[in-house]
């Protein structure tokens, strides 16, 4: 596997992880609510609103993440994404009540906001088969959506809701440190667009017909 292929694999897994982490709570809410002493029938309805700040920050912090990446480093921001989302997931598992879960999930949402404006920008860098790379990256993101209830449900079946946050968190942090080493050794450099691709930046010939 070439350095560029490995770079894309890291970025694709980042999209998978981004959506997976944002949906862990949707599956684990009932178990967490029961652990906090909420009534069985109303546990889900009572717990779900505590995830709302996470969803708001997931969107609201994206422009901030993009600005920091432009001023600082996209590779560094991807490292922050992996380690930050993993660490906050582990911290969320230590919650002793709904308010603490809301705070933990809100922090998780801040780090989750990094991926889309930063990771997808990195996927399209360098020209070439941009559409193909975006398509594959999108599949990984959708797999994260699909895998979240399956993975979380499996962990809940064998243990409890805390492990559902801890296990993915540990894996994400390990990947973050791996990407840091990969970038530190020069493997995460963005590919250069060819001179021909640079000369053709702009609208494709006949683009006006697409508007009719």
Regions found by a protein language model. Give the residues of each.
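Residue-level signature of mid-helix packing/kink "hotspots" within the transmembrane helices
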Residues: 23, 54-63, 145-146
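Paired small-residue
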Residues: 88, 99-107
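Small-residue (Gly/Pro/Ala) motifs that create kinks and tight helix-helix packing interfaces
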Residues: 29, 120, 144-156, 164
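Pair of pore-lining "gating" transmembrane helices in MFS-fold secondary transporters
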Residues: 2-30, 206-212
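Extracellular/periplasmic helix-loop-helix junction of adjacent transmembrane segments
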Residues: 28-59
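C-terminal membrane-cytosol helix-exit motif in multi-pass small-molecule transporters
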Residues: 169-193
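Cytoplasmic helix-loop-helix junction between adjacent transmembrane helices
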Residues: 104-141
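Conserved MFS/SLC helix-loop-helix module at the cytosolic interface between two early adjacent transmembrane helices
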Residues: 59-96
């Amino acid at each position: 596997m070439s350095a560029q292929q490995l770079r894309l694999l890291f970025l694709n897994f980042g999209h998978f992880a981004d959506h997976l982490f944002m949906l862990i709570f949707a599956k684990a809410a009932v178990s967490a609510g029961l652990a906090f002493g909420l009534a069985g029938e109303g546990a889900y309805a009572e717990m779900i609103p505590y995830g709302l700040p996470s969803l708001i920050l997931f969107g609201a912090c994206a422009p901030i993440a993009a600005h920091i990446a432009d001023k600082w480093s996209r590779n560094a921001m991807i490292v922050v994404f992996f380690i930050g989302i993993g660490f906050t997931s582990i911290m969320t598992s230590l919650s002793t009540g709904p308010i603490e879960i809301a705070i933990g999930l809100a922090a998780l949402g801040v780090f989750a906001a990094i991926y889309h404006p930063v990771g997808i920008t990195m996927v399209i860098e360098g020209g070439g088969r941009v559409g193909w790379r975006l398509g594959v990256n999108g599949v990984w993101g959708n797999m994260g959506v699909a895998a979240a209830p399956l993975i979380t449900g499996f962990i809940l079946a064998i243990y409890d809701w805390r492990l559902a946050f801890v296990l993915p968190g540990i894996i994400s942090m390990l990947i973050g440190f791996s990407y840091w080493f990969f970038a530190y050794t020069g493997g995460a450099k963005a590919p250069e667009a060819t001179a021909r691709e640079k000369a053709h930046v702009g609208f494709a010939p006949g683009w006006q017909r697409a508007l009719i």
